[in-house]
Structures are given as C-alpha cells and as structure tokens.
Amino acid sequence: PNSNIELVLSKAADVIPYVEHGVCDMGVVGKDTIMEKGGSFYETLDLGFGKCRFCLCGKKGEDFYAGYHTRTIASKYPKVTRDFFSRKNMDVNIIKIEGSVELAPLLGLADAIVDIVETGTTLKENGLEPYETVAPISARVIVNLASMKLKKQQIQALTEQLQEGLRAKDEAKKQEAKKAESKQDK
C-alpha cells in the first residue's frame, strides 16, 4: 500500500545491466541469462516458475562420449557450454548459433547442441534427444550490490512477500490436487 515500487519491463538480456548499474534495485531474470552473462549482483530468490533445463542433446541413439575426438557443439549459450565441458575436462569447439540450434547436428555442423529444453517436443520432432542435463533453469530475483546494503530492509521485506506468495501458490496447488484426487476416488 505505501510502496514506492516502480516496475520496468525489459528484455531478459537487459535486466542484468539495469540491476548491475543501479538503474533498478532488483530484477527478475532466468537462470539461463545469469549463467551466460554473469555479472555483479546478488541472486536472492528462485521464483520457481519458467522451469526448464539446459541440456546436451544430439541425434537419437548416438553415444556422444564414444571415442576420443574433439567434438563440435552448437549453442546460443557459448559460455554455459564452455563451462560445462570445462568441468568435464573435455576439449570442444563451440559454434554460436542464434536461431534453430537443433538443425546443427542434422545438417552436420555440430556433433551435438547445448540448448534449453522444456518439454523436449522440438528435439523429438528433429530426431534428437537429451543426453545429459547441464543445469536446471527457472526465474530468479537479482539485487544490485549497493541497493542490498542501502535498502536492505525494503529488499528483504519484498523478498519475504514474494516467498509468502510462492508458498501460498504451492499450498493452493496442493489443495487443488487433493480435491481432484478425492473426486477420482468417488
């Protein structure tokens, strides 16, 4: 009620610079953008929506890890891809693709892709399958470093309100599921 919250709508890629540079105190952005762009901010809350995952994907039935050759990976997310294969101590060539990444293995451009997978329908339609999950993704709250110090009380209060809203939503879903289950039992 006595809040002076101002909302700014922007593209996901712009949320981080707005928060980092203090134009906005807080922002909501996907973990995919955080992992790819990085930056100086606090990641304070997983909002639990927009859930999907980064996956290593390729042609159905192929053994991606067979053999010892350097693989070529296509992705819109070269940093995420590089970090993933670095953790596995694997040398890969990464090709940044902006559009339909799933075409790269089909056209012989890449051995596999690293991309966001929600349902897997697009992969199936293109004869691909997920080989491995790289990282889970969902919407996150980020906070400017200076704002966290200067406006800590307000930011904590808003974060707690968001958490309470998420808990209430989860509880409502559980109640709805129980009602549906009891109707089926009758």
State where each predicted segment sits.
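Domain-level signature for soluble enzymes in the chorismate/prephenate branch of the shikimate pathway
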Residues: P1-K186
